[in-house]
Swiss-Prot record:
Protein name, per record: NADH-quinone oxidoreductase subunit N
HAMAP family: NDH1_NuoN_1
Organism (species): Phocaeicola vulgatus (strain ATCC 8482 / DSM 1447 / JCM 5826 / CCUG 4940 / NBRC 14291 / NCTC 11154)
EC code: 7.1.1.-
InterPro entries, sorted: NADH-Q_OxRdtase_suN/2, ND/Mrp_TM
GO biological process terms, semicolon-separated: ATP synthesis coupled electron transport
Family: Belongs to the complex I subunit 2 family.
Keywords in alphabetical order: Cell inner membrane, Cell membrane, Membrane, NAD, Quinone, Translocase, Transmembrane, Transmembrane helix, Transport
Compartment annotation: Cell inner membrane
Coiled-coil segments on the chain, per record: none
Quaternary structure annotation from Swiss-Prot or TrEMBL: NDH-1 is composed of 14 different subunits. Subunits NuoA, H, J, K, L, M, N constitute the membrane sector of the complex.
Its membrane topology: Multi-pass membrane protein
Length: 472
């Protein structure tokens, strides 16, 4: 193979260049100039994003690497979400105990993003696993970023144990696939799949490994502890970017690799979806800590995301992508408000702390309310349309009962989302959170998220554009 063919991996190469530049800046910038790290990270990542807006279909290394226009769209979505997270991290990283670790945060985050790029463009299970681990190992460091705080260290330990267990299960499933199909190339595996018991077991192990990354029930047990203990900005990144990449990868592999076994994995997925949405909703109602609340909300949203996967056609990839784009905007808006209030109040993240928030911080309250309405699926916000497209995709595929159960759970979710809205607007507070000015980078991030919640709901052409690009 001509070595110049590697240059066609321009998304990965340009992101690697950003990684190296950030590493050098972190290494050589004096302490008095380290405040330039965040703007440089955002600028470099934006340039990288713009440089990859003209995608092409590329197959390299005999099919081990395969990038399509849709894969480029997915990478762009993950990159935009990462830029928003960088903006939200600004105030947190300026604290005295984290100021000296700014460079580490950006380098670790870029490492996880590079791993997700490889997951999305993998055409071979070996490359996919390398991307998965590249996305997971730095994430463990991010979860334990505040390592001298007990909750963060505990969250990091639990994340590492979950990651090790899920990786082991995933590898075991891959080994079974290789033993029965004789190859690990995505294009060649379907020809060797006949639905034997060993292949079904391999499918179960593969799915279980990725289910940990998506926090699907029953693989969710330490998710709430991880979200609560991790820094809020890291929890935001974990809930949307990491989960979005895993969902993209899962659908691509189920369509490309396990297409001949659709009957088997669709049955598994039906059970997982019902359990995930229902159990997560029941636990979310009981939560007072907003980070634990958002953890169970994230688990529930993962169940809705799986509805698009269940639909099982490449065309339904559009509903999955649209849902995740909207989910990124709404979830980052909520976590942005939580992070802002947490930084200015030295850790207030309980629901009762938000009582009467509208009287002292009306703008943050409105951002939080709009985002929660979108997550709940209330029209005319984008969350309503994202749920509608996902439900219609599953309905047209004949999963009527699953759609009905999901609709019932959507109604249940209104209760716990509106509990927070009620607290902010109606419930009195003798010691309310004081008024404060939100940092400019956070305001930019929240403005983009709110604009996304409105614009993605109003402009239906976004969904049509994704439908036209949805080629796995």
């Amino acid at each position: 193979m001509d070595i110049t063919a590697i240059l066609h991996m321009h998304a990965e190469l340009s992101l690697t260049a950003v990684f190296i530049l950030m590493f050098l800046l972190d290494l050589f910038l004096p302490a008095t100039q380290r405040h330039w790290l965040r703007p440089m990270a955002c600028i470099l990542l934006t340039i990288q994003l713009l440089a990859n807006l003209w995608p092409e279909e590329v197959t390299l290394f005999g099919g081990m690497y395969h990038s399509t226009p849709m894969a480029s769209v997915l990478k762009s979505i993950l990159t935009i979400g990462t830029i928003l997270v960088f903006l939200q991290a600004d105030t947190w990283l300026k604290r005295e105990d984290t100021r000296h670790k700014q460079g580490e945060f950006y380098i670790l985050t870029l490492s996880t993003l590079l791993g997700m790029y490889f997951m999305v463009s993998a055409g071979h299970f070996l490359l996919f696993f390398l991307g998965l681990e590249l996305a997971t190992v730095p994430m463990a460091c991010l979860v334990a970023f505040d390592k001298y705080k007990g909750h963060s260290a505990e969250a990091g330990a639990k994340f590492i144990l979950s990651a090790l267990f899920s990786s082991g299960i995933f590898l075991y499933g891959i080994s079974m696939i290789y033993g029965t199909a004789g190859t690990l190339y995505f294009e060649d595996i379907p020809a060797g799949l006949t639905g034997t018991p060993l292949q079904v077991l391999a499918l179960v192990f593969f799915f279980s490994g990725l289910a940990f990354k998506l926090s699907l029930v029953p693989f969710h047990l330490w998710t709430a502890d991880t979200y609560q203990g991790a820094p809020t900005t890291v929890s935001a990144y974990l809930s949307v970017i990491s989960k979005g990449a895993a969902a993209f990868a899962l659908m691509i592999i189920l369509m490309k690799v396990f297409g001949p076994m659709t009957e088997q994995w669709s049955e598994i997925l039906c059970i997982i979806i019902v359990a995930t949405i229902t159990i997560a909703n029941l636990f979310a109602i009981r939560q007072n800590n907003l980070k634990r609340f958002m953890a169970f909300s994230s688990i529930s949203q993962a169940g809705y995301i799986m509805l698009a996967v269940l639909a099982g056609t490449p065309q339904d990839m559009a509903s999955l992508v649209y849902y995740i784009v909207v989910y990124i905007a709404a979830n980052l808006a909520v976590f942005g408000v939580i992070s802002t209030i947490e930084q200015h109040t030295h850790g207030k993240i309980e629901r009762e702390d938000y009582n009467g928030l509208y009287k002292t911080n009306p703008k943050l309250t409105m951002v939080m309310t709009l985002a929660l309405f979108s997550l709940a699926g209330i029209p005319p916000f984008a969350g309503f349309f994202s749920k509608f497209f996902v439900f219609m995709a599953a309905f047209h595929s004949g999963y009527y009962l699953i759609v009905f159960i999901a609709l019932v759970n959507t109604i249940i979710s209104l209760y716990y989302y509106l509990l927070i809205v009620k607290a902010m607007f109606i419930t009195p507070n003798e010691d309310p959170i004081g008024n404060f000015r939100t940092a400019t980078p956070m305001r930019i991030s929240l403005l983009v998220c709110v604009a996304g919640i409105f614009v993605l709901g109003i402009i239906s052409g976004v969904y049509q554009l994704l439908s036209d690009t949805a080629i796995l």
